[in-house]
Amino acid sequence: MRQKYYIEAAARGLVGSCPGQARYLLWAYSSTHEDNSTFQETCPHCFQLLVLDNSRVRLKPKAKLTPKIQKLLNREARNYTLSFKETKLLRKYRDSASVLLITCRTCNRTVRHHGKSRSFLSALRSSRAASAASKASPKTPKRAAAGSTNISQSVHGSKGRSPSSTVRTPTSGQSTPICSSRNGSKRKKHFSQLKALLSQSASDKNPTLDFRHFLSSL
């Protein structure tokens, strides 16, 4: 590649002083290398550098969208069956591309440089849109999964905090269910004693039901 750039730079430097030598350098390099090693802005027939003085450039645009082609496109979008002639016309419209025509004034030959067709550009546009959608799609499930995990955690947490679903294991500092039942029976007994004290008008007759005795029993 460096040799190619060096020869092209040397040929451009010799165009004004010795154009024949410049053409010879370009021809010698192109004849000893592959076809894809041709120089840009160079005539492939006479190896003359194509500049504004010795070349003519024209642009042949691609086929325009006519009302007839628009009608055929609408029919195709509605899944209507098209004839062979109509299908061929649509294919010609989609495969049409702009052409750059460069005519060399030295050898009077024209070089054609074809552009990209409409079908290629539409496929490229759809592939870019698909790639952009594929890049953006993995982020959405992650966010949804994160939201679902948060919801599930909150649901499980709320369920775990409910007293009906928790299983409380007694520790060393806590009382067992037997002790709790005993305390409940004691409370009932004390409540009955207090009720008896309040209901009786004279407590002196029964010393076992004295209010001081009740408080000391607590």
UniProtKB/Swiss-Prot annotation:
Residues 130-192 are annotated as: Disordered. The keyword Phosphoprotein applies. Keywords: Phosphoprotein. The modification Phosphothreonine is found at residue 140. Residues 130-146, 161-172 have a biased composition (Low complexity). The keyword Phosphoprotein applies. Coiled coil: none annotated. Residues 147-156, 173-183 have a biased composition (Polar residues). The modification Phosphoserine is found at residue 126. PANTHER family: UPF0711 PROTEIN C18ORF21 (PTHR31402:SF2). Belongs to the UPF0711 family. This is UPF0711 protein C18orf21 homolog. It comes from Rattus norvegicus.
